[in-house]
UniProtKB/Swiss-Prot annotation:
The protein, known as: Deoxyhypusine hydroxylase
Enzyme class: oxidoreductase
Annotated pathway: Protein modification; eIF5A hypusination
Recorded name of the encoding gene: DOHH
HEAT-like PBS-type repeats: from-to residues: 62-88, 95-124, 201-227, 234-260, 267-293
InterPro entries cross-referenced by the UniProt entry: ARM-like, ARM-type_fold, Deoxyhypusine_hydroxylase, HEAT_type_2, PBS_lyase_HEAT
Annotated cofactor note: Binds 2 Fe(2+) ions per subunit.
One GO term of the biological process aspect: hypusine metabolic process
PROSITE patterns from the UniProt entry: HEAT_REPEAT
Molecular function, one GO term: deoxyhypusine monooxygenase activity
Length: 326
């Protein structure tokens, strides 16, 4: 075992005291989380400190990022605490949703009971949480029946996140559901809000389009963001995927989602973060104008997006300077 992976919880707490400090500004704590993610996310001590941080903040944005990264760790030790968060209705819906998604990402059968309970409309009133649990159950079932490879990113894929569903692949087959291949076929699945297409299958189309990463695929995803009218959870994931792709052509759809006062906050927040990831100076005015928004997760996401803008502007400026000096 490396020295890095053998650090104790106490050592990681000391190294990430700013992350655990409720008095630290949000942007500072977010930077510390990203640093921990690169440093020791997949260790028992790392995920313990991530989970301990959740109850040190009332920022839904930070809570949601912490729960997301707990899921990305793949550590089964995180399951009991994530289950507690999912069950606790005093947490914001976005935080609870992210705990459920994290349970699906970890993929442990230990979580099946709580996921089944919160996928039931008779016990869980919040649609985004029910839908997240539905996706998590489907992902765990696919992992159990088809193996780890069925839910893993394709070989050579640039996107290494553990997603709520896999993309379509040769490992996915069904006599009832043919595998879509073209952008047009994938878009038809993505945009099917009739109820005939399971949400998990729509997600599979989404991640397949992301992996294709063509302009036509991006355009289809933008349509999904703005044309879907049945699932805020789905639209928020499309915005996240567009942030991963970082294509300027997606900015009009993302800006429209951020500005839409009728849109769910969870969607608007992901749209803001996606704009931050793209880091086009042209979007600075809209992010600045929503950085004082009355909805906390929208406001905080715009603040973080502006920090991302600043980082990439400095990074690109340094790279340009080095090219000039070479």
């Amino acid at each position: 075992m490396s020295a890095l992976n053998s650090r104790t919880v106490e050592e990681v707490r000391k190294d990430y005291a700013k992350l655990l400090d409720p008095q630290e500004p949000l942007d500072s704590r977010m930077r510390e989380l990203y640093r921990l993610k690169e440093d020791c996310l997949k260790t028992a001590a790392g995920v313990t400190v991530i989970l301990e941080t959740i109850d040190t903040t009332d920022s839904v944005l930070l809570q949601h990022e912490l729960a997301y990264n707990a899921g990305q760790s793949g550590r089964e030790e995180a399951v009991p605490e994530l289950e507690r968060i999912l069950r606790t209705t005093s947490y914001d819906v976005v935080t609870r949703h992210e705990a459920a998604e994290a349970l699906g990402a970890i993929g442990s059968p230990l979580a099946l009971q709580v996921l089944e309970a919160h996928s039931d409309p008779t016990t869980e009133p919040e649609a985004p949480i029910r839908e997240t649990c539905e996706l998590a159950l489907a992902r765990i079932a696919m992992k159990e029946t088809k193996g780890d490879a069925a839910v893993a990113p394709p070989s050579g894929c640039e996107f290494v996140s553990v997603d709520p569903s896999p993309a379509f692949s040769a490992l996915y087959s069904s006599t009832d559901e043919p595998v879509p291949h073209t952008v047009e076929e994938l878009e038809a699945v993505l945009l099917d809000t009739s109820g005939r297409t399971r949400l998990f299958r729509r997600y599979m189309a989404m991640f397949t389009l992301r992996n294709l990463a063509t302009e036509a695929a991006v355009a289809a995803l933008c349509r999904g963001l703005r044309e879907d009218n049945v699932s805020a959870l789905f639209r928020h994931e499309v915005a996240f995927v567009l942030g991963q792709l970082e294509r300027p052509s997606s900015q009009p759809a993302l800006i429209a989602a951020l500005k839409d006062e009728e849109e769910a906050p969870m969607v608007r927040h992901e749209a803001a973060e996606a704009l931050g990831a793209i880091a086009d100076p042209a979007t600075l005015p809209v992010l600045e104008s929503y950085a004082t928004h009355h909805e906390p997760i929208v406001r905080d996401s715009c603040v973080v997006a502006l920090e991302m803008h600043k980082y990439w502007a400095n990074f690109n400026g340094l790279a340009h300077q080095q090219q000039q000096e070479a």
